[in-house]
Curated annotation (Swiss-Prot):
It comes from Shewanella sp. (strain W3-18-1). GO terms for molecular function: flavin adenine dinucleotide binding; oxidoreductase activity, acting on the CH-NH group of donors; tRNA (5-methylaminomethyl-2-thiouridylate)(34)-methyltransferase activity. It comes from the Bacteria. It catalyses: 5-aminomethyl-2-thiouridine(34) in tRNA + S-adenosyl-L-methionine = 5-methylaminomethyl-2-thiouridine(34) in tRNA + S-adenosyl-L-homocysteine + H(+). Residues 273-680 are annotated as: FAD-dependent cmnm(5)s(2)U34 oxidoreductase. This is tRNA 5-methylaminomethyl-2-thiouridine biosynthesis bifunctional protein MnmC. The lineage of its organism: Bacteria, Pseudomonadati, Pseudomonadota, Gammaproteobacteria, Alteromonadales. Its cofactor is FAD.
Length: 680
């Protein structure tokens, strides 16, 4: 169940405003959709041999083109990635209002069904990319909201899977300037084509726009043309300009190494070390791409580490600046939420149970400093109401269903999820899609790189070789020689389990202040958590149990329901989360720290050193990757980090911008200093 925002916050634009921003392409939808379907079928037929077809669309319009692409994708041996660029962000409520008021879906029941599935994913009006995955990965839709040139220029060219074809909707056809055309060209295959929609003379492309597209090497045709060219021969000079753009991009971000490009037709042997949320979701994202994996877990079952809690809050981390950290966590939270929905709503027998409740999260302050911080977050941005909105004390009491008597910030799409069930469900789905071999009670003590690949060594066995190995082993992330220099710290967390009774049992949303308190699940609330750096042991600690209770008293003083929190049973769970200083997860190539230090000695604080580090690929351990450092918000960040690493391992477009990828890179702590000309 999703907590609903109040109506005044939810409705920001009425139908006349929406239809102006997201115009229908044609008034006669049935006739237009018939021609559109024929055109889209030709596109799929022209690229039928590709296992992944990447298409681009300029403009969302009223959404019919997007839905029609989805409907037309019927090839069971091909996956579709549709990237839609729309300058005006829109949310699910407004999309539904647009479709209901226009009745554009009334006569197309097959599109109406897809529209309902799209709305179920709760697209939100945030800047950046939202990845929506349907049909076990056969159809993926990337919604890029915000300034189109900014969105295009922020993306990395995918050499193996570039955009093969573009559809430009009429209301944007003559408004895209030359810089946008070049950015489209940068992300496209050298033989990519552009289709426009000219239903009448007034809606066609201007001669200037046609010339601009052609000046970037694009073949431009109306969508009604009988033939889709798949191998036009662009001008060699224009192709050179595209390649220069890509090289400039690659050079500017050389310090942020990506996975080595592998053949898309040759499956790679991938080993994942770890048995928690990160491992399971990486296996799922790879399985959706048809890639088999082997998982090595030291425990008797999944989710015995930081992923083993009964309940965990899932909500975005927001900052006053809405910087890369804030934008990443919004994207990641929404992606994870959609994963939970997809796993729990799949048709039987593929449905996988996950205890969860999207009952909302209510964030409040607990002292003067935290109040100033929360006020700054609330007031500094015009946050979409589906992300979060301010509530007064009376509204907060109503949402919590118990008295807290404090104003706060309410996240209506958020809530709680059972982490270990979430991990188990992801693995179960992955095993339904492809071969995923799970090695339980198999502790990897050492990893070794030879010319033929990586070997994993236990006390009794040696596994391998593997072309790619991912370290997703949580608290043990730094146990190997190749990873022991990672700048990441372990923090102990004790979560208290308290009986649901009296007023406390009525709690209806997750409370987050100095610590958190969840609604009851199977007769218990979760209250936590302690935060102890580099713990000496993982035994139950009575002092931390009392500290958890004290945090609630500090957060909500003098409330009667505090007396209902019974700690006498000493019921708790202790885990370790790995935390980075900047709160970003670690995702990407494992840095070769000794080599970085060695190179630093040769390029230390000279005039050329900053340029060297900016333009030289940073040293990495070939074929070794890191997925960890999820901290206290792994439920929100883990699945998207895993999805992005899976895309990287398979040389596919990544649903994050270049700046955010740099923030996630495991080498960032060293490179941040080196790029500024500072000493290590």
């Amino acid at each position: 169940m999703t907590a609903e925002p109040n109506k005044p916050c939810q409705i920001k634009r009425d139908y006349p405003q929406l239809i102006n921003l997201y115009p229908a392409t044609a008034h006669n939808d049935a006739h237009y959709l018939s021609k559109l379907s024929i055109y889209q079928q030709r596109v799929f037929e022209a690229h039928s041999q590709q296992k992944l077809l990447v298409l681009g669309q300029m403009g969302l319009g009223n959404g019919l083109e997007l839905l029609s692409w989805w409907r037309t994708q019927t090839n069971p041996n091909q996956r579709l990635l549709l990237k839609v660029f729309e300058p005006h962000p829109i949310n699910a409520y407004e999309l539904k209002l647009l479709w209901d008021q226009s009745a554009s879906l009334a006569k197309v029941p097959e599109l109406e069904l897809l529209a309902q599935r799209l709305l179920h994913t709760e697209p939100t009006a945030i800047i950046g990319c939202q990845r929506l995955i349907f049909d076990d990965g056969r159809t993926t839709i990337d919604l890029h909201f915000g300034d189109i040139q900014s969105q295009l220029s922020s993306l990395i060219h995918s050499p193996l899977h570039p955009v093969q074809h573009w559809l430009v909707l009429p209301h944007l056809q003559n408004g895209l300037h030359q810089q946008i055309h070049w950015q489209m060209a940068k992300l496209s295959d050298d033989s990519a084509t552009v289709a426009t929609i000219g239903l009448n003379e007034s809606s066609g492309l201007s001669e200037t726009t046609v010339n601009r597209f052609q000046a970037c090497g694009f073949e431009v045709r109306d969508f009604t043309c009988a033939e889709i060219q798949t191998n036009p021969q662009p001008d060699a000079i224009l192709l050179h300009e595209r390649h220069v753009l890509r090289r400039q991009d690659a050079k500017a971000y050389a310090f942020n190494p990506m996975a080595a490009i592998l053949s898309s037709d040759a499956p790679s042997s991938i080993a994942i070390i770890g048995g928690g949320l990160a491992s399971a979701h990486l296996a799922l994202s790879l399985a959706e791409r048809g890639q088999s994996t082997q998982i090595f877990c030291k425990d008797a079952k999944l989710g015995q580490g930081a992923s083993g809690n009964r309940q965990g809050a899932i909500y975005p981390l927001l900052t006053p600046e809405n910087d890369e950290l804030s934008r990443f966590f919004q994207q990641a939270f929404l992606f994870s939420r959609r994963r939970v929905q997809a796993l729990t709503s799949a048709p039987a027998p593929n449905q996988t149970p996950i205890s969860h409740n999207f009952c909302g999260v209510l964030q409040t302050a607990h002292d003067e400093r935290s109040q100033l911080r929360l006020d700054k977050i609330i007031q500094s941005q015009n946050w979409p109401s589906e992300i979060a909105y301010r509530v007064d004390a009376q509204q907060a009491n109503c949402l919590a269903n118990i008295n807290i008597d404090k104003s706060g910030f309410f996240y209506p799409l958020a809530g709680w999820v059972c982490p270990y069930e979430y991990a188990e469900a992801a693995l179960q789905k992955a095993q339904q899609l492809t071969e995923v071999k799970l090695h339980l009670e198999t502790e990897i003590l050492e990893i070794e790189h030879q010319s033929e690949g990586w070997y994993l060594i236990t006390a009794k066995h040696r596994f391998g070789p593997f072309a790619q190995v991912v370290l997703a082993n949580g608290a043990a992330l730094t146990q190997f020689d190749a990873s022991n220099k990672l700048q990441i710290s372990p923090f102990r967390g004790q979560v208290s389990h308290v009986p649901a009774q009296f007023q406390l049992s009525q709690l209806a949303t997750v409370l987050c202040a100095n610590g958190y308190l969840t609604p009851s699940h199977e007769g218990l609330h979760c209250l936590g958590a302690s935060y102890v750096k580099e713990p000496k042991h993982l035994d139950f600690c009575p002092q931390e149990q009392q500290e958890n209770l004290a945090k609630m008293h500090e957060s909500y003083p003098d409330q009667g329901w505090l007396d209902d929190i019974d700690m006498s049973g000493n019921n708790a769970r202790v885990g370790v989360r790995m935390v980075t200083r900047d709160h970003f997860p670690m995702m990407g190539c494992a840095p070769d720290v000794p080599k970085i230090i060695k190179d630093y000695a040769q390029h230390q604080l000279t005039k050329e050193s900053r340029h060297y580090w900016q333009t030289t690929p940073a040293p990495v351990h070939e074929g070794l990757y890191i997925l960890g450092g999820l901290g206290s918000r792994g439920l929100s960040s883990g699945p998207l980090a895993a999805e992005c690493l899976a895309a990287q391992l398979c040389s596919e477009p990544i649903p994050l911008d270049k700046a955010t990828l740099c923030k996630l890179n495991p080498n960032r702590m060293w490179l941040r200093k080196l790029l500024k000309g500072k000493s290590l």
